[in-house]
A protein has these predicted regions:
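Flexible, glycine/small-residue-enriched loop-and-beta-strand segment within the central core
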Residues: 34-43, 63-73, 78-143, 169-170, ...
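Short, electropositive, low-hydrophobicity segments enriched in small/polar residues
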Residues: 54, 112, 155-158, 172
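Terminal amphipathic alpha-helical/low-complexity segments used for targeting or macromolecular assembly
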Residues: 1-51, 55-56, 96, 129, ...
Length: 181
């Protein structure tokens, strides 16, 4: 039987994390209400709270970032409108990767096999030049390979090979991504 009472009493965050969460609560309105083209301002705010943000990264003001200090975004990557970055664990987004409109990256879960239901924080890695399309969900501990595409609305709970396109719920391989030019 689950011991929910024990879970609710468990210390899930260190005092340092709690302090940073409170600071982020005060800074977040400066992020959220900044004009849409002010990408540099939002990069500065996130960096000031420990995020590792590369050059020319576009993060839109309506994106939700849970723990800035657990975010790494490579050069020229993008986090789109209303994307939800639930980064209890580290989330790494490679150079020129795109997290589209309303995509959800979830680097947190619970161990359902233990009675106290402890919090787990498996990291997520999005490879360089990968694309997580609109309304897609990427679960805890998943790696999306370089150049891979997660189709719109897909649910990804397993690693995706480099340059592979996955679609559906659960996500399954559709075909290999080919770049023509």
């Amino acid at each position: 039987m689950l011991d929910i009472k024990q879970n609710r009493r468990a210390m899930k965050y260190s005092s340092g994390e709690m302090s940073r969460r409170v600071l982020w609560m005060f800074v977040q309105p400066l992020f959220r209400f900044s004009p849409r083209p002010c990408f540099g301002w939002r990069r500065l705010l996130l960096r000031s709270l420990g995020a590792k943000i590369g050059r020319n990264v576009h993060i839109y003001p309506s994106a939700t970032i849970y723990f800035p200090w657990n975010l790494e975004a490579g050069d020229e990557s993008a986090i789109g409108e209303y994307a939800f970055i639930y980064n209890l664990g580290r989330i790494t987004i490679g150079a020129r990767a795109t997290i589209s409109h309303r995509a959800h990256l979830c680097a947190g879960t619970h161990d359902h096999t233990k009675s106290d239901f402890p919090l787990l924080r498996p990291p997520i890695t999005i490879g360089a030049e990968a694309w997580v399309c609109a309304d897609a969900f990427v679960g805890p501990g998943v790696t999306i390979g370089e150049g891979a595409i997660v189709g719109a609305g897909s649910i990804v709970m397993k690693d995706v090979k480099p340059w592979m396109i996955v679609i559906g719920n659960p996500a399954r391989e559709s075909k290999r991504r080919e770049i023509t030019q």
